[in-house]
Amino acid sequence: MDNKSQRRNNENQKKVEALDFLSFMRRPNCIAEILRQHTQIIEESNNYYYLKMKTKDNKSQGPLRSLLCLPKNVNQKTDSAFCSVDGYNVKNKFLCTRSPNQDSLYQFWSMAYKKNIHIIVMLSPIDNLMRHRYWSLEEDEVFECREFRIETLQVDVQAFYITTTLQLKHENGAVRKIVHFNYTGWPVDNISHHPKEFISFILTVNSARDEVDKLSARNSHTLGPIMVHCSDGFNNSCVYCLLDICISEFGATSNVSVPNTFSKIRQQNRHAISQPENYVYCYQALYVWISSISNSLHH
């Protein structure tokens, strides 16, 4: 790494306070800087995976696998992937995956059962799932998937999301409630976002997680990760993870570092936020949220 790249890397690792973050976002060239960050971090993560694979014994795997650097948690048989992502000071807070199709429907519910999932966050438009829907939209209806029975107990429709309380029952008699959050405000063009509403949605999910955590502690159960899914499993889903981490870190320390957070996520999910517009959106959403907090403190 040359001196210029090293300096930029050091800048990316910095945690900044609210006023510095807001000042950066008001610069005329901030978008260009954000895009440069995105390109640099992707290059660094690609090098990280290449070197990681290179140090292993790949003789039996062949050169193609070394170049692709396929993550271990990719199930090539079903073409579905489940990737754990750490939260802020929370190990494996998220389990990111792609929205299930007919071939991966059973793997989806099987993983939800095995990982003790209590919260599902869906970031795909519901219209995209009509052919491969994995739960019933109407209260008291039941969706069946092999040994799993998923009953819809309650549906609550809000402006930008739908909360559905599900009951997951295994044929062995085990029963668990799952809160399903479907964010309906993600734009089709991937540009016309509603940052304030999306941040509010993330905070709502975290409040629900806190309630489930308290209940799990009382019953001596282990709280599973939040299962987050989108069309590909690593763009919208990892945007959600990145914003959640930055919000949590800012709430605890009053500091934030988007590039540092992004770099850590890329080490767990090689393909995370590969679309530059999604990375820009992370900054824009945090700008709206931190601005609102800053304004409220000065009034």
Curated annotation (Swiss-Prot):
It holds the Pfam family Y_phosphatase. It comes from the Viruses. Belongs to the protein-tyrosine phosphatase family. The keyword Hydrolase applies. This is Probable tyrosine phosphatase protein J4. The active site is at C230. SUPFAM superfamilies: (Phosphotyrosine protein) phosphatases II (SSF52799). Its EC number is 3.1.3.48. InterPro entries: Prot-tyrosine_phosphatase-like (IPR029021), Protein-Tyr_Phosphatase (IPR050348), PTP_cat (IPR000242), Tyr_Pase_cat (IPR003595), Tyr_Pase_dom (IPR000387). Keywords: Hydrolase, Protein phosphatase. CDD domains: PTPc.
